[in-house]
């Protein structure tokens, strides 16, 4: 009888510990959602609207990025505030409304973030990708599922573009997307960066060579668009969804 009692006790302890370990992931109630897929653009030339931005207009704490329908601009939404950009007569223009449709959209509702200082050793795009995965695991984020992140500070340089696709062109490539509209570099300028990380959404919302999709906005709101390359500067801050109980969203 004694052995039965101890066996049941051990089983109960193991079960409780297993449940506690799973809580770290299961209680994170934010969900990354997406509409559209990069592979449909690149392989099929499908750049039609997949979602109306008005569908997320009334959601709180929305962070979103993507491309406008027909690839006529970039989508950046920070904390439910749109900073969408387009090219009009070779000039960058902003649209701060939800009166647009997207051919690709990735979004999540996050009401609290945890700030982390990025080590000075993290400089390149590749180093950043490894660092993001490492920090996510440290902070009990399930890296088998997509998650959003933010960065703030003054990078040494950022290469960016805002797409302005010729709708009669049915042959797509990443280089053609970059050159179709406006593109350039930002150097040593304070910015805010929104990104989504996933190792399982290649050709869906990340390109096949990376686990990250990032967009950038300058703090003075003079520029926003797709981030192509980055060299980090000193003192930059990285932010992950805060997994503490007070940060849960329904």
Model segments located where?
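Bacterial signal peptide processing site
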Residues: 17-19
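Contiguous hydrophobic, core-forming segments of folded domains
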Residues: 84-147
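C-terminal structured interaction module
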Residues: 215-250
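N-terminal low-complexity or amphipathic/hydrophobic leaders
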Residues: 46-104
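C-terminal motif of bacterial Sec signal peptides marking the signal peptidase cleavage site
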Residues: 12-15
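Mid-length scaffold segments of soluble, non-membrane domains
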Residues: 121-126, 131-182
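Short, hydrophobic/π-rich interface segment
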Residues: 167-220
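Sec-dependent signal peptide recognition
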Residues: 2-9
């Amino acid at each position: 009888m004694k052995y039965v009692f101890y066996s049941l006790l051990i089983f109960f302890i193991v079960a409780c510990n297993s449940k506690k370990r799973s809580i770290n992931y299961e209680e994170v109630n934010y969900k990354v959602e997406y509409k559209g897929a990069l592979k449909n653009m690149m392989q099929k030339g499908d750049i039609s609207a997949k979602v109306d931005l008005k569908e997320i207009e009334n959601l709180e704490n929305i962070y979103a990025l993507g491309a406008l329908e027909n690839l006529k601009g970039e989508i950046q939404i920070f904390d439910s505030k749109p900073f969408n950009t387009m090219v009009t007569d070779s000039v960058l223009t902003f649209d701060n409304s939800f009166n647009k449709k997207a051919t690709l959209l990735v979004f999540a509702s996050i009401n609290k973030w945890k700030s982390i200082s990025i080590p000075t050793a993290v400089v390149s795009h590749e180093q950043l990708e490894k660092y993001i995965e490492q920090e996510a695991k440290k902070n009990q984020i399930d890296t088998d599922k997509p998650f959003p992140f933010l960065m703030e500070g003054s990078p040494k340089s950022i290469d960016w573009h805002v797409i302005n696709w010729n709708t009669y062109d049915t042959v797509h490539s990443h280089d053609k997307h970059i050159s179709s509209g406006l593109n350039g570099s930002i150097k040593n300028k304070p910015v805010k960066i929104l990104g989504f990380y996933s190792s399982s959404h290649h050709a869906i919302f990340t390109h096949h060579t990376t686990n990250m999709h990032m967009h950038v906005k300058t703090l003075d709101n003079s520029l926003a668009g797709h981030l192509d390359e980055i060299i980090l500067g000193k003192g930059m801050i990285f932010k992950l969804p805060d997994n503490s109980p007070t940060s849960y969203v329904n």
